[in-house]
């Protein structure tokens, strides 16, 4: 990932299963910048329905990465279903969600991407896999959503592809300033698990 980020002069994001020296495994997301700087996030909400909790440990720290003037909150797949994880702090401009959502739940994928964008007044970048597992078919439909819930770009094909859209921090901040929803949000802290 470091080589690809450097060669393409772009940050890359993806997730891998990682086994630590203590034997604990994590579903870890990596945010790799072109200069070789790497930030990580360990998935917080493990997908019990799929047995993920039998193999992985839960991450308990949110990760916000600064890159080219934007602050990106990293979330992984099932985390998207839990709005409190992203809602309780206003410390980011965009959410990046790397996911493994099957075709059978594509409608939910689209709704949740838009909901997280609207309720947090932020961009949401959702990157979903394609391909097949023994019990699931994945059709992608990666998307970039703006702070009003509008789809800027969306993949329609069942193959790996590159999507691009311009995200503009000035217009994001102007929208937040004009329509001050975040000022009225409930203030709370998450208790350690």
Where are these regions (language model features)?
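Short, low-complexity, polar/charged sequence segments that are solvent-exposed and flexible
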Residues: 32, 58-61, 92-96, 114-118, ...
């Amino acid at each position: 990932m470091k080589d690809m980020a450097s060669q393409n002069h772009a940050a890359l994001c993806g997730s891998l299963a990682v086994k630590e020296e203590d034997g604990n495994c994590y579903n870890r997301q990596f945010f790799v910048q072109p200069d070789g700087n790497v930030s990580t996030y360990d998935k917080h909400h493990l997908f019990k329905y799929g047995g993920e909790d039998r193999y992985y440990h839960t991450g308990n720290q949110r990760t916000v990465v600064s890159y080219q003037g934007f602050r990106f909150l990293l979330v992984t797949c099932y985390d998207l279903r839990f709005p409190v994880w992203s809602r309780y702090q206003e410390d980011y401009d965009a959410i990046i969600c790397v996911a493994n959502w099957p075709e059978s739940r594509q409608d939910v994928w689209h709704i949740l991407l838009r909901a997280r964008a609207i309720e947090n007044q932020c961009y949401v970048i959702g990157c979903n896999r394609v391909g097949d597992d023994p019990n699931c078919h994945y059709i992608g439909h990666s998307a970039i959503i703006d702070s009003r819930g509008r789809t800027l770009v969306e993949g329609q094909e069942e193959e790996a592809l590159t999507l691009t859209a311009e995200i503009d921090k000035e217009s994001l901040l102007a929208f937040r300033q004009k329509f001050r929803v975040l000022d009225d949000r409930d203030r709370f802290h998450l208790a350690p698990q």
